[in-house]
């Protein structure tokens, strides 16, 4: 069950906020505090803004910033770590009151993060491998995410079969998920990896679909591939569409992460997407922003805020209506708790 978090105690009435993620510079949403206090400027430094998971995460950040009467600026690096480092430097030099970092790396951002700390700017990380005293990390339990999805794969396929892994290196959560995957293969010697690929691009789902189509042509017979394990929902979307178009829906997809778009795909007739392990991305965004406001107020914040995932199975969902993230808790008991 996911850890419950209290709301930030100081709630300020806010004006409407519009936040648009953009490349290069930042897009700003204003929410002036009704109390007359100067609105706190918050920078969200993103490695990439791809798919509906990212959109719902940003919306969660925006909601919390709006509630606290702040101004949010989103900097999107379009997967370019050097650009991400430049965006962080810009946020520090522009004297933002708080900085949120999403999926950065120590190699690219350690120096910039330390610069922010030296200037007394609160920084809160999400799924980023930087370790600096006083800089908290909000993270999903990536090992548990991988374990839940992989164990479901094993359970539904009697602990055996040929699988395709879709994964990419260079992201802190991916590296943790890989550790669990390696242990999984040792635990289930009758499950064999026959192919592995994956890359994070500006069109990840479409690029994955193209690559998965090639894999299906290489293994054309029913039974050649038992399942696909996708370490990110953008990978799962591409794999699912390729499998559907090829008419190979005997191949099941097990994945990590969830969004409204993913739910629609899971609920399609004869969808191969069988299960996914996830944390609500809107909740991640809210907690990420909530934590930086706690830091701004001088409140005590733990070094690590870990969010526990939930397994969502296709079989949990009704056949006669389309479920959204907003009403998923009606069908998956632990969702949103």
Task: List the model feature ranges, each with a label.
Residues 2-4, 22-337:
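A residue-level marker of the well-folded mature domains of exported/periplasmic proteins
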Residues 14-16, 59:
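Hydrophobic alpha-helical membrane context
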């Amino acid at each position: 069950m996911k850890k419950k978090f209290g709301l930030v105690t100081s709630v300020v009435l806010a004006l409407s906020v519009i936040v648009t993620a953009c490349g290069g510079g930042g897009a700003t949403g204003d929410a002036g505090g009704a109390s007359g206090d100067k609105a706190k400027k918050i920078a969200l430094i993103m490695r990439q803004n791809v798919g509906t998971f990212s959109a719902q995460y940003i919306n969660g950040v925006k909601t919390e910033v709006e509630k606290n009467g702040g101004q949010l600026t989103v900097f999107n690096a379009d997967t370019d770590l050097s650009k991400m480092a430049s965006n962080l430097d810009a946020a520090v030099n522009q004297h933002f009151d708080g900085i949120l970092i999403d999926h950065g790396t120590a190699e690219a951002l350690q120096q910039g993060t330390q610069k922010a700390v030296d200037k007394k700017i609160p920084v809160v990380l999400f799924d980023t491998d930087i370790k600096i005293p006083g800089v908290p990390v909000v993270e999903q339990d990536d090992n548990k995410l991988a374990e839940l999805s992989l164990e479901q794969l094993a359970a539904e396929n009697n602990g055996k079969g040929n699988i395709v892994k879709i994964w990419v290196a260079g992201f802190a959560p991916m590296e943790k998920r890989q550790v669990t995957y390696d242990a999984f293969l040792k635990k289930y010697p009758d499950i064999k990896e026959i192919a592995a690929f994956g890359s994070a691009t500006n069109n990840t789902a479409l690029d994955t679909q193209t690559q998965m189509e090639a894999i299906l042509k290489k293994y054309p017979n029913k039974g050649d591939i038992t399942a696909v394990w996708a370490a990110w929902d953008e990978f799962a979307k591409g794999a699912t569409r390729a499998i559907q178009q090829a008419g190979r829906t005997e191949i099941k997809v097990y994945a990590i992460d969830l969004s409204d778009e993913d739910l629609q795909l899971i609920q399609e007739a004869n969808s191969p997407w069988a299960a996914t392990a996830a944390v609500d991305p809107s909740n991640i965004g809210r907690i990420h922003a909530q934590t930086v406001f706690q830091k701004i107020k001088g409140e005590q914040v733990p070094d690590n805020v870990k969010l526990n995932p939930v397994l969502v199975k296709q079989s949990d969902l009704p056949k006669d209506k389309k479920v959204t993230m907003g009403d998923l808790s009606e069908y998956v008991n632990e969702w949103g708790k």
